[in-house]
Amino acid sequence: MAGKAGRKQASSNAKIIQGLYKQVSLFLGMAIVRLFISRKVTIGQWIKLVALNVPMFVALYIIVLSGKPKYDGNRVVKQGIDLNDNTNLISYFFDLIYLSLFGNIGIIAFRTFKFWWCLLLCPIYAGYKLYGLKNMFMPGAQQTQADNRSKNANEGQSKSKRQMKRERRGETDSKIKYKYR
């Protein structure tokens, strides 16, 4: 029972990696065939195809290296990191792979490399995430001032909630001071 979760994660990772291999080989193969049957193909277009797919291959290599399970016979030795987890760096590698495949779809359908401009979304998105992370650990001047104001307001508020509620009721119910049963 103890190794059941590890075996489950290992089989899930193996399926994900196998699916990635199928998708990459399908779309890249179709893009290569499309360039082969095109009439006006230059060496520069082949170099572009290779150069623009290098980030995808690096991301795929890192995913396989870190997520591929290792077996010793029928026993799982290492299950790899969880590839279904969206909170780690692996999710960005998946995004990079899918954006590269989108660029290959542009080659397949329209014989253009303009779809590869979508790869600029990766560093922009990473910068956005890093900026949010920076603000979480190193707040700016505006956030520091707002925190100081809220601390001062909390220090000035020395009365408990019950006392404040009594004062409010006292202001509204000034006619009735005692209630008998």
UniProtKB/Swiss-Prot annotation:
KW Membrane (keyword) present = yes
Q: Which gene encodes it?
A: ENV10
Q: Which residues cross the membrane?
A: 16-36, 46-66, 90-110, 113-133
What spans are recorded as compositionally biased (Basic and acidic residues)? 168-181
Q: How does it assemble?
A: Interacts with SND1, PHO88/SND3 and the translocon complex subunit SEC61. ENV10/SND2 and PHO88/SND3 form a complex with the translocon in the endoplasmic reticulum membrane.
| UniProt keyword annotations, A-Z | Endoplasmic reticulum, Membrane, Protein transport, Transmembrane, Transmembrane helix, Transport
Q: What is this protein called?
A: SRP-independent targeting protein 2
UniProt KW Secreted keyword: no
Question: What function does the entry list?
Answer: Functions in the SND pathway, a SRP (signal recognition particle) and GET (guided entry of tail-anchored proteins) independent pathway for targeting a broad range of substrate proteins to the endoplasmic reticulum. SND functions in parallel to GET in targeting proteins with downstream hydrophobic motifs. Involved in vacuolar processing and morphology.
Give the knockout phenotype.
Answer: Exhibits cold sensitivity and leads to internal accumulation of precursor CPY.
All ranges on the Cytoplasmic side of the membrane:
1-15, 67-89, 134-181
Region Disordered, annotated ranges: 144-181
Query: Known InterPro entries for this protein?
Result: SND2/TMEM208
Subcellular location(s) of the protein:
Endoplasmic reticulum membrane
The family annotation for this protein states: Belongs to the TMEM208 family.
Segments of skewed composition (Polar residues):
144-157
Q: How does it sit in the membrane?
A: Multi-pass membrane protein
Question: Where does this protein chiefly localize?
Answer: endoplasmic reticulum
Topological domain (Lumenal) residues are: 37-45, 111-112
Q: Give the GO cellular component terms, alphabetically.
A: endoplasmic reticulum; endoplasmic reticulum membrane; intracellular membrane-bounded organelle; vacuole
Task: Name one process (GO BP) from the record.
Answer: vacuolar protein processing
